[in-house]
From Swiss-Prot:
This is Protein CYCLOPS. Its main location: nucleus. Phosphorylated at the N-terminus by CCAMK. Forms homodimers. Interacts with CCAMK. It is found in: Nucleus. GO terms for biological process: arbuscular mycorrhizal association; nodulation; positive regulation of DNA-templated transcription; regulation of DNA-templated transcription. It comes from Lotus japonicus (Lotus corniculatus var. japonicus). InterPro entries: CYCLOPS. Involved in symbiotic signaling. Required for root infection by symbiotic rhizobia, infection thread (IT) formation, and nodule development. Probably not involved in nodule organogenesis. Involved in arbuscular mycorrhizal (AM) symbiosis. Required for fungal infection of the outer cortical cell layers, and for arbuscule development during the AM symbiosis, by binding, as a complex comprising CCaMK, CYCLOPS, and DELLA, to RAM1 promoter cis element thus promoting its expression. Acts downstream of CCAMK. The keyword Nucleus applies. Induction: Induced in nodules 21 days after rhizobial inoculation.
Amino acid sequence: MEGRGFSGLYRNSSEELFLKTVMESPIGMPVPSMEMLGFKNVSQGFRADSEELFKRWLTNGEGYNSSSIGFSSRLSKRISTELVNGSNQLQVGVASDGRNNDKPFIQNNLLANDVSGDFNFPIRDPVDRELQPSNLFLAKAWFLSDQRMTRSRSSELRRRYSEMQNGLATQGIESICMDPQHGAEATKQEVANFNGYNYLSMCELPSQKGSFMSPSNSCSSNFNTPQFGDMDKVSSCVSMLKGTLQRRRLSSQLEKEAAEDDLNGIFYPQEPLFQTGFDQGQENWSNQTPVNVQVDSIGEVKDHGVLQTLEGSTNPVVDGFANQINQIYVGTASGEPSQSESSNAAPVISSGLDTCEGPINSNQTLCESSWKQVGVSKSSENTQNRVKGFREQIMDNLKDDKKRKSLERYGSITSAVSDDKGDTTKKRRVERSRKMAEAKERNSTPSVPSDMQAVLKRCENLEKEVRSLKLNLSFMNRKDSEQTKQIEDLQKQNEELADEKERLLEEIERILSETEKM
């Protein structure tokens, strides 16, 4: 019966799947949706997600303390559990009020996935769900042997595992410290709204051992590491996990932000800080002012002995940091370089904790403080020098452009081009420039009395008349010269005609004389 569930999905019809879901489920699941019937995420069931499988093993303890399940049964249930995972992704489980009215618990998608794959094991109380370290160690060993761990897959796995750890820790501390009447509802809302996943909080699994949630987010660390002690081992594991690639990514991101915002010297947040998972209807978290927060931080609020932790979901740079979990407060993860070359420093407990002033039972928790100015002195100096260099270069370019334009205007650069043009244009330009110079000289003369101005005006008019007369005389002289030339020609013709007349007369006389003789 280990292969029961939805293993025969592709050869069963939708009606059989619906009946099997309703009748075989021991935990009162809601009515299956279209995704559960196999009409949407069917193609995604062939390849099981290793990270989700790893989270389910860590959360549910490998089948609820059932060591008799073999590796073959786990492999047969991967397709069925992944198919049901698509339908219950955004649903909060139904509280089993009929079984135990005193101990309501949240049934999330992780619990429903493992139970839907194996129906031999009924639901037990949270007290009976003690996780055996041996089973968890076997699950982790099988996971490491099954999938080869590359840098990208390991970073993604560590990020998701650290998010799961932080969600469980903050929910548990909130449920302990907050009011009893608001504790259950707030925890349910936080579980329902935490990044789209539903996790069991620590307060609802009181019998979990300290080795369940290791402060280290590595895939090869020992599960028997104590949760709230021996911080040196945790820091060493975390420092071994962080690689040179993420450190370079962090430095490049910080340089980009410094280049953008360094004119004022302050980093301005690009994302909203303190994105809590509570709805707006709950007035306890309706008005919150973020204070004293740096990048990759989990803020902390103290109120005269009452501790309330706010999870800051600002992870813009490195999303693989494991936030250390202490019994009293949650610290910030610092990105200082460690001694090892290929790793970052271990997360250090931050001393810059935010405090909240006000009564304990107030509906609005007001956190007032000022932003920390991020210390980027070296990067700020570099960027300022770079900006100054750019500014000087731009000014030099503008000056060079002005000089070039002035030289072009005076003809010292484009003289060869101007020589190629015709003489007429050149003469015209020279004449125009001369006239403009004369006009400037006339305009620049000092002011004279009115009678002198009249005399000067009369003189100018006389000069104009003289010029016109000279032009007329020259024209007439030219005409006269032409006429005289014509007269001379006529006179020559007249003389020639007179000579011809005389010759003709002589010839007539000779002829008459000859006729008389005959």
